[in-house]
A protein has these predicted regions:
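Bacterial N-terminal signal peptides that target proteins for export
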Residues: 1-9
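N-terminal signal peptide c-region/cleavage motif recognized by signal peptidases
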Residues: 17-21
């Protein structure tokens, strides 16, 4: 059967118009990860971020138009994830001109200046760690009175629970649910491979693991995570986090090298990157990330691995010391870190996992951009490359 072209065109236009009318029906109410109900009377266009390191959220939802929607953000990506910043600036040069805002937690956020920005934000995305303080300070009321909606997201405190909800609620709020659902489908399918593999091997040994938070950021050691942040991956991956007991219920805290030695982890993971200080000076972190400098990575890795107390650990002696790109700790792309952890904690079960390929694929699929880099490593191999 043949349908006349004119009829096909009429049907296509009719369907498209119908979809647009249906999708753009406002007001809509969404419930964010903080349990707040937020009602939107129109489709938000101008987005502000309380932390620029979650810019990938905009990329997932808006693809190549991500930068067009960003009208303000904190300047943390440039300092805390410089290779990420350089990569995005290359892709979206206009990001260099986005107005910067202060940190809510430190009291540097100027609400009056924010309200008067041009173009004016109509949606402010605030991370979960700052939302209660913003409410207590009266910032949420002032923003709401000015017509600026606030949506809470979380990729940091409880990533396994809140990552997909954060993406999907934002997608719903800006009338791009299809993009949110596509991301959720991809993320869930990859996560299920890990969960199902572990379920099929109930007798797999439970490795003891320690995560060194921000390795190389300062000379002191050892900040770490218990239940929150990347520490949340550990029980899901059928491993034991040695920080749980010493931190006694806290999400994050400090352990002495002596306590780490006493606990003797089987696997040691450094969460690190090539931070720069506010005045542009490099730190001693391992500069994993986009466009890696392998000589610099080798040197920084060697320096951190030469700490005498580290060499007293079982993990070191058995060559189970690894590094993960720290910005994954507050990113919707945290799936990549989970895959690295799975390989390192259970190498025999997950030898075929390819986390860097996953990251490249996610960026191409959701951000429509090609990238390469080094986002995780075996530290012993890095020292000998």
């Amino acid at each position: 059967l043949k349908t006349p072209i004119k009829t096909l065109l009429s049907l296509t236009v009719g369907l498209t118009a119908s979809n647009i009318a249906l999708a753009s029906t406002y007001p809509i109410t969404v419930t964010d990860v903080a349990g707040r109900q937020v009602t939107f009377d129109h489709q938000p266009q101008n987005i502000a971020l309380s932390t620029s390191r979650i810019f990938p959220l905009l990329e997932i939802i808006y693809q190549k138009e991500a930068a067009k929607h960003l009208v303000a953000a904190r300047d943390d990506m440039r300092v805390s994830a410089p290779s990420m910043y350089a990569s995005y600036i290359k892709q979206y040069p206009s990001l260099k001109n986005v107005p910067t805002i202060g940190l809510i937690k430190s009291g540097e956020f100027d609400v009056e200046r924010f309200i008067n920005l041009k173009p004016k934000p109509d949606l402010f995305i605030v991370d979960l760690s700052n939302i209660k303080l913003a409410e207590d300070k009266g910032l949420l009321k002032k923003l709401n009175d000015a017509g600026i909606k606030v949506l809470t997201v979380d990729f940091r405190e409880n990533p396994l629970k809140n990552t997909l909800k954060s993406v999907q609620v934002f997608a719903d709020a800006v009338n791009r649910s299809k993009q949110g659902d596509a991301f959720a489908k991809y993320y869930t399918s990859h996560l299920n491979v890990i969960k199902e593999t572990l379920a099929q091997h109930p007798n797999t040994p439970t490795p003891r693991v320690f995560i060194e938070r921000a390795a190389g950021y300062s000379d002191s050691c050892c900040r770490t995570f218990a239940n929150g942040n990347m520490g949340a991956y550990i029980p899901m991956l059928k491993a034991e986090n040695i920080a749980i007991a010493p931190l006694d219920g806290s999400e994050t805290g400090q352990m002495s090298p002596e306590t780490v030695i006493t606990s003797q982890p089987d696997v040691y993971i450094m969460q690190t990157t090539g931070w720069i200080t506010n005045d542009g000076q490099p730190t001693s972190g391992i500069p994993l990330g986009y466009s890696p400098n392998h000589a610099a990575i080798k040197q920084a890795t060697t320096d951190l691995m030469n700490r005498p107390w580290l060499q007293a650990l079982t993990a070191y002696q058995q060559k189970n010391v690894y590094s993960i790109y720290m910005p994954f700790y507050n990113s919707p792309y945290n799936l990549v870190a989970i895959e690295y952890f799975a390989k390192w904690l259970h190498p025999s079960l997950f030898s075929t996992l390819q986390p860097e390929k996953t990251f490249e694929e996610m960026n191409l699929k959701f951000g429509h951009r090609h990238l390469s880099g080094q986002f995780g490593q075996d530290n012993f191999k890095a020292m000998n490359q």
